[in-house]
Design a protein with these regions (language model features):
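Conserved nucleotidyltransferase catalytic core and NTase-mimicking acidic/glycine-rich helix/loop elements
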Residues: 118-248
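Short aromatic-enriched loop/helix-cap "lid" or pocket-rim segments at secondary-structure transitions
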Residues: 38-40, 80-81, 178-180
Length: 248
């Protein structure tokens, strides 16, 4: 993977050092091939920033770089037509372009801002629900065994997904650039107080007497996310909302 990454970084340099004003656009997937993205790969949200002088930074949850484009509205739209499960983010000087399922739109936000009225794709929602369901069984098992260390480990392991879930049910795009736990922003979300309470309970836990508090807060969070993702999304202005029925 390191060799592939080095190859792609070199490709970035060659394309952007010639014109530092070009906006970078990156697609990422779990497999690398010359033709671009693999539709069946596990795709996460990825950005590449290009600053004056050709400096660049990469941010990603998983996957490796597969193809880089210049800013080209028609080509971007074509990407979404051909690859149904890709979200693309490209930005420069506080301008951010976010597109999902081919609905191209310009949002006057900085890269760190939370975007209002975000319509999450059924693909990403399905992944979130799956991850929470899998970890829930392990958390229940740790609680029944009164294994505080394992319960804390599992809660922190799933913590980013809890945060992502809260942003989703509040119709906001989840933060992607290291802002997973921003206490002030999270407290503004429905259910944000529960997440903060969970974090504090974990941080201050010292004995097995704390296991009930941690577990109860987690279950309140889980129940909130489960109830919201089981019904709230039906009212969204999503032309493809019928696809939600496959997993709600």
């Amino acid at each position: 993977m390191d060799n592939i990454r080095d190859e792609i970084i070199q490709n970035v340099k060659e394309k952007f050092e010639a014109d530092s004003n070009v906006i970078g656009l990156v697609l990422a997937g779990s497999s690398f091939n010359n033709s671009g993205i693999n539709k069946n790969s596990d795709i996460d949200f990825v950005v590449v920033t290009i600053s004056p002088g050709g400096q660049f930074e990469f941010y990603h949850d998983k996957g490796i770089w597969v193809e880089i484009f210049y800013e080209d509205e028609e080509r971007i739209k074509k990407c979404f037509e051909d690859n149904d499960e890709i979200m693309i983010n490209c930005f420069k000087d506080g301008r951010i372009l976010i597109d999902n399922k081919g609905l191209l739109g310009e949002l006057k936000k900085s890269a760190m801002d939370i975007v209002e009225d975000y319509e999450i794709s059924d693909y990403n929602l399905k992944r979130l629900k799956y991850r929470l369901q899998v970890i829930l069984l392990k958390i229940k098992n740790a609680y029944l065994k009164k294994d505080l260390d394992k319960l804390i480990f599992l809660c922190m392991y799933v913590f980013p997904h809890l945060i992502r879930g809260l942003y989703i049910i509040n119709h906001k795009i989840p933060p992607t650039l290291g802002l997973w736990y921003d206490r002030d922003r999270i407290l503004k979300l429905e259910g944000g107080d529960l997440l903060v309470n969970l974090f504090e309970a974990i941080k201050n836990s010292s004995s097995k007497q704390d296991i009930d508090e941690i577990y109860n807060i987690f279950m309140q969070l889980n129940n909130l996310l489960d109830s919201k993702t089981g019904g709230a999304f039906k009212g969204w202005k999503d032309k493809r909302k019928e696809h939600f029925q496959t997993f709600l």
